[in-house]
Amino acid sequence: MTDAADPAPGSGPALSPRRGGWLDRIERLGNALPDPVFILAGCILVLVAVSVVAAAAGWGATNPITGERLVSVSLLSGENITRLLVEMPQTLTRFPPLGLVLTVMLGAAVAERSGLFAALLGGGVRRLPSPLLTPAVFIIGLFSHHAADAAYVVLIPLTALVYAKAGRHPLVGVAIAYAGISGAFAGNIIPGQFDLLMLGITAPAAQLIDPAYGVNPLGNWWFTLAIGVLFTPIAWYVTDRIIEPRLGRWTGGFPDGVEEADALGVLSGAQRRGLVWAGVVALVVVTVFAALVLWPGGGPLLDLSEQGPRRLAPFYGSLVAAFMTLFLGCGWAYGAVSGTIQTHRTLIRMMAEGMRDVAPYIVLAFFAAHFVALFAWSNLGPVLAVNGADALRGLDLPRPLLLVSLLGMSSGLDLLIGSASAKWSAMAPVVVPMLMLLGVSPEMTTAAYRMGDSIFNIVTPLASNFPLVLIICQRWQRDFGIGSMIALMLPYSIAFGLAGIALVTAWVSLALPVGPGAPATYSPPAAIVQSQVGPS
C-alpha cells in the first residue's frame, strides 16, 4: 500500500510492481486475434461447412411448438447461393440493429458535437461535495453510457482533476469513473442506444423458435436499473475502503500545461443558457410522446385492440424515434444558444460526421447481418436449439445455473473480444431459442449475457478504450503501466462479478420481470407443453 502520494504529477512508483505471466499470455493471445469483422467472416465460413455436413447427415429435429420437422439445409445449395447473391443488399438493410443505431446516431452526433454531453457531464461533477463524490461520479458514469466515447474523453480526466483539487488521489477519480462507465456498462438508469442494439439482435433470434414473439427496446430496463442500484454502494465501498487507502492522499499539483479553471471546464454564460434551453426542449419532447400515448380516448401510440402491456407496443416501437428526436432537439438547442451551431449547415455537418463515426459498425453489421441470415436459412439455429434444449432438459439443471453459465461464458469471451454486439450476434441465434425452450425469456437471457459482458471491460487490455484510460493515468503517474491498471480495477471486477451472479440467480429464481412487458420466464404455446408430457 502506498502511504504517501506522489510529490508531483508524473512521478512516483507504479501502483503494483508485480507482473504476472498470465497477463502477458492474455495480451499476446488477444493481439493475435483478428478484427471482429474477420472473426464474423470466419464464423460464416464455419457455418457454411457445418451446414453442408449437417444436411448430408440428415441432422434435424421436431419443432415442439408447431410440430414441424426441421431439417438442416446446406448453404451451398443452388437456392441458398442464389438467395445470398440476389438478396445481399436487403440482407444488410433488414438487419434490425443497423437501422436503430443509424437513426439514433443522427441525433446523438449533434448532442455530442455541440458540446451538450460534455457540458452535462462537466457541470454535474464540478458541483459535487467531497464526501459524496464517489457515489455521485459512479451514478454519472451510469448516465454517461448514452454519451458513448464522450464519457471516456470528458468524464474520466475531469473526475481525476476534481479529485486532485479535493486533495484526493486523482487515480481514485479515474478508477471510479472508469468503473461506472465501463465496468457497470450492463447497468443504466434510463435505457439508451445500447439497449436498442442488443435487444434488436435478440428479436430475430427469438423468432427462430417463435415467429410471433416481439421484443421491445425497454425489455431489460428493470434489470439494468437494479444493476445501477446494487453496484453503486458496492463501487462506493471498493473505492473508499480498498482503492483509496492503497493510493493515499494527493499532495501534487495538476499536470503540466493544465490550468485549474480550464481543467475543471468552467461553463460560460452562453453554455449555461444552452443547458437551460436544452432542458426546455427535452421537456417538450417528453411531453409530446407522453401525449401520444396518454391522450384521452387512446393516443396514436396506444393499441386499443390489445390488452395489458401489449397495448404499448406502438410506443415501444417509437422509442428509436424518441431518442433520436430528444438528442437532436436538445443538441441543436444547446448548440444554437452556446454558439457551437452557427447555421443549419453546421447541424447537417455534425450529423454527417456522426454517420462517418459509425462507418466501422456498418462494416461489422454487413457481416453480422449475413451471419444471422445464413444461420436462419440453414435451419441450424432451431435444430441446435431443440436438440440442445433436450440435452439440457435431460441434465435437469436449474434455470439460475444455466444463466450463470451464460454469464461466465460472455465474461470469458469479453477478455478476448471487445465488441458486445459482435459476440451477441454470433451467440444469440443459439442460446436465445435454446433457453426459450427451457422456459427462460429472451429478455432474461439477454440481461444475463450483458451482465457477463461488462464485468471484465475494465481489466482487459483489449478493450477499445483501455489504452485511452491508461494514458490519462500516465499524465498523473508516468510509470503507471498495464499491470498497474489491472491492479487498480480488478477489485471492481471481482465485486461486480460476484454481485452480478447473485443478482441473476435471485432474479430468475423469483421470476421478476426484466422490463416493462418482459417477464423473466417464457411460456411456450400448448404444443411444446404437449411434446414434453407426451400424449395422455
Per-segment meaning from a language model:
Residues M1-A32, A61-L76, E244-R273, A520-S536:
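Intrinsically disordered, low-complexity non-transmembrane regions of multi-pass membrane transporters
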Residues P17, G21, G60-F95, L208-N216, ...:
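Interfacial loop/helix-cap signal at membrane boundaries in integral membrane proteins
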Residues L40-A55, V101-A109, I140-L142, G180-A184, ...:
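Hydrophobic core segments of alpha-helical transmembrane domains in multi-pass membrane transport
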Residues V52-I81, F194-M198, G297-Q307, S378-N387, ...:
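Interfacial/capping segments of alpha-helical transmembrane domains
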Residues E79-N80, Q90-L98, V125-A136, P170-V172, ...:
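Membrane-interfacial loop-to-helix junctions in multi-pass transporters
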Residues V101-L102, P129-A160, K165, I362-A368, ...:
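Hydrophobic alpha-helical transmembrane segments of multi-pass integral membrane proteins
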